[in-house]
């Protein structure tokens, strides 16, 4: 057991450096090509001319598509192992290392050029990849899946600063595949990854800065639960839209470079209306949490961002969908909160409260992982007073969504982009 905990610590350290490496590569490319050193793609888009704002996501998609197509032709004659940690965990615990690195590089290109896709997906993949490399060299074959799971959880902890949520994501999503007894090493890896990531970044700040002064009362619990019901209905709708967009892009029968470029061009067109559509949505979420906008502004940005996410994901852009889902959930919750705020004196606090609730419940509705979703929002914001209400609402959202749509967003996205 001591040996496993020691290996889990090493895996956590490797995962933290893998995530940091991807993050610094992003910052370097943004500085080189966008002249942006703020770390915010929304700021980068704001400072670009309309033509560059329009074409940059398309060019990034084109470059990523050419890379993926070239690699596919180069390796046409050899057998392929999984390039995703979920696939590796469901098979024999082995990766196609070269293909996974190419996939991560393609993700780096589309993410830094403004596509509305999550950077965290590639970060988690690289963390799992680093864990797999170490495991295959120093551990017996029957443990390989455990260390990939530890790497994925550690990558999630380093990317989102949420070690418990990262650990429980692995447990909830892989329920039946991984024994609960294995959670010890997973948690150790996740916590170590967070600590090392904090040292690398010279910061232990929360992912999102929120000033929620409300004390949760009976009325608020009712609003939180009703938001869970709303998210439970919206989750399957989002999944259906994503699936329909993917089928639409596939039906065009375009070569991968053209398909990804088309997705990027749509994002570029939408960014002419609002630069907030660029990127995974992190900076927009933070700005909404700092000062919730008015109803019509939320609605406008929400519609543009939703279309950008659908275009990026549907075109096959390699990347994650968790963070874009967080923004969509925040916007749905805030739209609901703004509507209710007309009848309550503390409308601003209700909007913020239901925005956070929307983030958690839509994540639960799309991932079918209610405990992870609850803990993730609490860990990212530090608002642990919301935990009881969020847990109830997330379970309700997950049950409703699972009833209406069998597959989670992660399994659907993996099936489409693997």
Curated annotation (Swiss-Prot):
GO terms for biological process: response to acidic pH. It comes from the Bacteria. It is a multi-pass membrane protein. Keywords: Cell inner membrane, Cell membrane, Chloride, Chloride channel, Ion channel, Ion transport, Membrane, Transmembrane, Transmembrane helix, Transport, Voltage-gated channel. InterPro entries: Cl-channel_core (IPR014743), Cl-channel_volt-gated_ClcB (IPR023790), ClC (IPR001807), ClC-type_chloride_channel (IPR050368). One of its GO terms (molecular function) is voltage-gated chloride channel activity. Its main location: membrane. The keyword Cell membrane applies. It is found in: Cell inner membrane. GO terms for cellular component: chloride channel complex; plasma membrane. The chain crosses the membrane at residues 5-25, 54-74, 146-166, 168-188, 222-242, 260-280, 291-311, 316-336, 352-372, 380-400. Belongs to the chloride channel (TC 2.A.49) family. ClcB subfamily. PANTHER family: CHLORIDE CHANNEL PROTEIN CLC-E. Probably acts as an electrical shunt for an outwardly-directed proton pump that is linked to amino acid decarboxylation, as part of the extreme acid resistance (XAR) response. NCBIfam families: PRK01610.1. This is Voltage-gated ClC-type chloride channel ClcB. It comes from Escherichia coli O9:H4 (strain HS).
């Amino acid at each position: 057991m001591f040996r496993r905990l020691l290996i889990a610590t090493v895996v956590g350290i490797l995962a933290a450096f893998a995530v940091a490496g991807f993050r610094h590569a992003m910052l370097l490319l943004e500085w080189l090509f966008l002249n942006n050193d703020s770390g915010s793609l929304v700021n980068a888009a704001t400072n670009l001319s309309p033509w560059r704002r329009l074409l940059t996501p398309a060019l990034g998609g084109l470059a990523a598509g050419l890379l993926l197509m070239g690699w596919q032709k180069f390796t046409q004659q050899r057998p392929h192992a999984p390039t995703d940690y979920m696939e590796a965990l469901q098979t024999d615990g082995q990766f196609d290392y070269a293909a996974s690195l190419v996939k991560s590089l393609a993700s780096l290109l589309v993410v830094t050029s403004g596509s509305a896709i999550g950077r965290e997906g590639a970060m988690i993949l690289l963390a799992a990849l680093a864990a797999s490399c170490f495991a295959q060299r120093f551990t017996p074959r029957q443990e390989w899946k455990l260390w990939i799971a530890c790497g994925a959880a550690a990558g999630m902890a380093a990317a989102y600063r949420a070690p418990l949520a990262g650990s429980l994501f692995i447990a909830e999503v892989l329920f039946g595949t991984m024994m609960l007894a294995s959670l010890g090493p997973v948690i150790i890896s996740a916590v170590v990854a967070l600590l090392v990531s904090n040292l690398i970044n010279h910061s232990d700040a929360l992912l999102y800065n929120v000033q929620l002064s409300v004390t949760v009362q009976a009325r608020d619990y009712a609003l939180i639960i009703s938001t869970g019901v709303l998210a439970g209905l919206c989750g399957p709708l989002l999944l259906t839209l994503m699936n329909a967009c993917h089928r639409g892009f596939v039906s065009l029968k375009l070569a991968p470079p053209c398909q990804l470029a088309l997705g990027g061009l749509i994002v570029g067109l939408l960014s002419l209306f609002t630069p907030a559509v660029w990127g995974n949505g992190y900076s927009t979420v933070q700005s909404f949490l700092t000062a919730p906008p008015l109803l019509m502004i939320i609605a406008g940005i929400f519609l543009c961002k939703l279309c950008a996410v659908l275009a990026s994901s549907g075109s096959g852009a390699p990347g994650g969908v968790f963070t874009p889902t967080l923004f969509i959930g925040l916007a749905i919750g805030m739209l609901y909160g703004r509507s209710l705020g007309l009848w309550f004196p503390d409308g601003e606090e209700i909007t913020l409260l239901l925005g956070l609730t929307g983030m958690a419940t839509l994540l639960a509705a799309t991932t079918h992982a209610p405990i992870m979703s609850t803990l993730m929002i609490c860990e990212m914001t530090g608002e642990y007073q919301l935990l009881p209400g969020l847990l109830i609402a997330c379970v309700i959202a997950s049950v409703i969504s699972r009833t209406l749509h069998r597959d989670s967003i992660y399994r659907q996205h993996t099936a489409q982009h693997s």
